[in-house]
Regions:
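Short, polar/acidic, helix-capping and beta-turn segments at strand->helix junctions
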Residues: 2-126
Length: 126
């Protein structure tokens, strides 16, 4: 059975989708943008480092609502507006995800919603 996740402190989705869902032992966190807690139509201040920290914080909150932590993440997908930002993203990512690190995909995209620099989704197992 599938259940929707709506974590407190995570801004409402900017489209018709859940912040995340659970299906059995799996937890799926929807792509998170570095949006403001006060306004889901506005990005936080800062560059790629701050935006990466924000999306991981949001993912962490969604996972916590489902009883998971970042160490339960099995796979992530990062969407970057500029692949040249990957080194900065990797620095934040390495600090937040423990070994063994999740499997990961990185995709450069032509544009992200709200002109964000990064978006991330993940799959975790509880």
């Amino acid at each position: 059975m599938k259940y929707s996740i709506n974590a407190q402190g995570v801004p409402a989705a900017i489209g018709p989708y859940s912040q995340g869902t659970t299906a059995g032992r799996l937890v799926f966190a929807s792509g998170q943008l570095p949006i403001s807690a006060q306004n889901n139509k506005e990005l936080i201040a800062g560059g790629i480092t701050e935006q990466t920290e924000r999306v991981i914080d949001l993912i962490q909150s969604i996972l916590a609502e489902a009883g998971c932590t970042l160490s339960d993440v099995a796979q992530t997908t990062l969407y970057l507006a500029n692949l040249n930002d990957l080194d900065a993203v990797n620095k934040v990512y390495a600090q937040r995800f423990t070994t063994p690190a999740p499997a990961r995909n990185v995709v450069e995209v032509s544009r992200l919603p709200l002109d964000a620099l990064v978006e991330m989704d993940c799959i975790a197992c509880r």
